[in-house]
Design a protein with these regions (language model features):
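The feature captures the beta-strand-to-loop junction immediately N-terminal to the Walker
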Residues: 49-51
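A short, surface-exposed alpha-helical micro-motif characterized by mixed small hydrophobic
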Residues: 228-230
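Conserved ABC transporter NBD signature motif
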Residues: 72-79, 91-92
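Helix-to-loop junction immediately C-terminal to a conserved catalytic motif
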Residues: 64
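Catalytic Walker B motif of ABC-type/P-loop ATPase nucleotide-binding domains
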Residues: 187-191
């Protein structure tokens, strides 16, 4: 696996793929994220790190659309998408994974990937009767694409197995394949290394690098600093709901304030 070279990647300020501007989030009077701004550059792999309680998961969910900011905004190409739900953000090319994937256990691996297919005419009841030819063509194209995605994530041999037989790492690869069915340009990865054995983690990292080489912009939350340092050209560290530091993985991890935040728990 060849990790991306920081010198070869655009800076976030050059052309952000997605950005948060002065975002604050309150829960019942408790401020979990306070005046946070960040930009994910086009073609960048950005790491978001911090101790438990730092607010990074809330920040991630604000970017993904699972939460709406109390103030500030989330923007794509200058458009405020703060009020849009995750399924609406897919239309803007933004998709996410979850720390704990929950596939449909009795459906096959292939069928789980097909769930991610977007804008299928056959989803509308009467289209099956009025436009059967179009429905069949779209279903065929989606099936072919799903097989390509399974090949990409190295799960082709398990295509017809029920998803319940997959290991934790394989479920993360399955979820990545499902996300890719939507052709996202911005991919938000929620702790992709959590619960994954070392061989499968290498596969996941290799796939992330391959996606980045295709021009995908990727933001990941991760506690595995080895993964962060190998994948990310830039890292943002949070503590107590605020920006603590940003820069290269080496510089941020060497910052005494970041070290203290981790040792102190950050909450």
């Amino acid at each position: 696996m060849q990790p991306p070279s920081p010198a070869s990647l655009p800076t976030a300020a050059s052309s952000p793929a997605i950005e948060a501007r002065h975002v604050t989030k309150h829960f019942d009077g408790l401020t979990v994220v306070s005046d946070m701004s960040l930009q994910l550059g086009r073609g960048e792999i950005l790491g978001l790190i911090g101790p438990n309680g730092a607010g990074k998961t809330t920040m991630f969910n604000l970017l993904a659309g699972s939460l709406k900011p109390s103030s500030g905004g989330i923007f794509i190409e200058g458009q405020d998408i703060s009020s849009q739900a995750p399924e609406q953000r897919i239309a803007h090319g933004v998709a996410r994974t979850f720390q704990i994937p929950r596939p449909f256990p009795e459906m096959s691996v292939l069928e789980n990937v097909l769930v991610g297919a977007q804008k299928q005419t056959g989803e509308r009841l009467f289209s099956n009767f009025l436009r059967p030819g179009l429905v069949r063509r779209e279903e065929k194209a989606a099936l072919e694409k799903a097989h390509v995605m399974l090949e990409f994530v190295t799960l082709s041999r398990l295509a017809h197995e029920p998803a319940r037989v997959l290991s934790g790492g394989q479920r993360k690869l399955l979820e990545l394949a499902r996300v890719l069915m939507a052709d996202p340009q911005v991919i938000l990865l929620d702790e992709p290394a959590a619960g994954v054995n070392p061989p499968l983690l290498e596969v996941i990292m290799d796939r992330v690098v391959a996606l980045n080489a295709e021009g995908k912009s990727i933001l990941l939350i991760e506690h595995n600093m080895d993964m962060v340092s190998r994948l990310c050209s830039r890292v943002i560290a949070m503590a107590l709901g605020k920006l603590l530091d940003q820069g290269s993985p080496a510089d941020v991890s060497a910052n005494p304030a970041v070290v203290e935040a981790y040792l102190g728990g950050g909450a």
